[in-house]
């Protein structure tokens, strides 16, 4: 399976284009948002035969259903739909998106796997069993991790298996600025040439978390073996600080799992800008 990446910049650009085609004003209201979720758990067998392998798709999609600001609600739904299901669903109703996405997944599974499965069945030895690699699954589960004043942190967890030694999983975060109706990027939070200094802080925090004192010791443990340790746009804000979230293979091998590095605000004061959202979190 190919690793699934979500580009925050691509999400911002695609959704912004949709939103500004609908409305050219930004409302500063944080929205009094209320949320619900749409849940799907469907299993579909090859050839509709329960004796044959199947795919399973699980969706738990959290989304705003009520707000004092309809444009804010629509904006958030566009971003959430984009990051969970892809740009082509932007502008559709959440219920229709989830239903269509699940249907497309099942249809594609059968279209791709049934011919190969039939060929394997035809060519197998009389007592052989066609491999379990035809049993696929996919889950997309999202929730609101934090909603406070002008900030909403939205988390999406993906998990997928398409044959092979193991499945793939990853988590993606959107830190929504509700006044601007778009996700925050590192450039919105930090000032100046922050990259090098922030990289040093991440290394130092990783060393502290792992009770070692050198970069080499971290590298011996497996850190930085699959990618450079540097600030990532996949982060989330909390009252404790900023957490940089590295999915499997970003900086470590699969066996080490994802890596979270939380830097307290007090350690980054010299790098932080004057974004009011940070002030609200630190109060």
Question: Which residue stretches match the model-derived regions?
Answer:
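Compositionally biased intrinsically disordered regions enriched in Thr/Gly
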Residues: 22-283
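Bacterial Sec-dependent N-terminal signal peptides
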Residues: 1-34
């Amino acid at each position: 399976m190919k690793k699934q990446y979500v580009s925050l910049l691509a999400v911002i650009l695609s959704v912004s284009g949709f939103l500004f085609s609908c409305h050219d004003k930004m409302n500063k209201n944080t929205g009094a948002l209320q949320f619900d979720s749409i849940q799907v758990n469907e299993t579909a067998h090859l050839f509709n035969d329960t004796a044959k392998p199947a795919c399973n798709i699980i969706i738990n999609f959290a989304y705003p259903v009520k707000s004092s600001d309809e444009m804010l609600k629509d904006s958030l739904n566009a971003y959430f739909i984009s990051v969970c299901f892809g740009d082509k669903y932007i502008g559709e109703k959440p219920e229709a998106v989830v239903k269509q996405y699940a249907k497309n997944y099942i249809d594609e599974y059968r279209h791709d796997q049934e011919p190969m499965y039939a060929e394997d069945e035809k060519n197998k030895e009389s007592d052989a069993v066609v491999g379990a690699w035809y049993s696929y699954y996919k889950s997309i589960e999202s929730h609101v991790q934090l909603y406070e004043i002008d900030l909403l942190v939205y988390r999406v967890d993906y998990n997928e298996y398409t044959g092979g030694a193991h499945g793939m999983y990853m988590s993606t975060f959107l830190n929504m600025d509700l006044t601007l109706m778009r996700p925050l990027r590192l450039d919105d939070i930090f000032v100046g040439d922050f990259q090098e200094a922030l990289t040093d802080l991440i290394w130092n925090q990783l060393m502290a978390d792992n009770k070692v004192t050198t970069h080499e010791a971290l590298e011996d443990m497996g850190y930085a073996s699959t990618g450079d340790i540097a600030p990532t746009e996949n982060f989330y804000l909390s009252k404790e600080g900023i957490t940089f979230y590295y999915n499997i293979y970003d900086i470590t091998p699969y066996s080490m799992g994802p890596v979270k590095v939380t830097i307290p605000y007090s350690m980054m004061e010299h790098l932080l800008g004057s974004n009011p959202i940070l002030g609200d979190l630190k109060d």
